[in-house]
Amino acid sequence: MAGKFECYKDKAGEYRFRLKAGNGETILSSEGYSSKSGCDNGIASVRKNCVNPDRFEKKKTEAGKFRFNLKASNGQVIGTSQNYSSDSGCDNGMKSVAKSAPDATVVEES
């Protein structure tokens, strides 16, 4: 099953997207955008940048968990992962984004 981007409006009225892997697990979430076109541009940026391993930035949280950000060429964060309990789990999450995002469908949620 292919991955998908879910584009939705949050309670604050901002547009956001989340990338779900083929198994339904959310693997990347965006920050809020003021417009639908901004959200669409964010999705396009994920597709463009996820194929470059240098665009992923892995971090260890104070609680000892691992997470990553996907960044655009200008250094701006495009999306953030969930927390992973292991370094290898985080690496697998990055690989899953790189594999899922380029061909993921976009679903509009209301």
Q: What is each PLM-predicted segment?
A:
Residues 39, 90:
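Alpha-helical recognition helix of canonical C2H2 zinc-finger domains
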Residues 53-55, 108-109:
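A short, aromatic/hydrophobic, helix- or strand-capping loop or linear motif
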Residues 98-110:
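Glycine-rich beta-strand-turn "strand-cap" elements at beta-sheet edges
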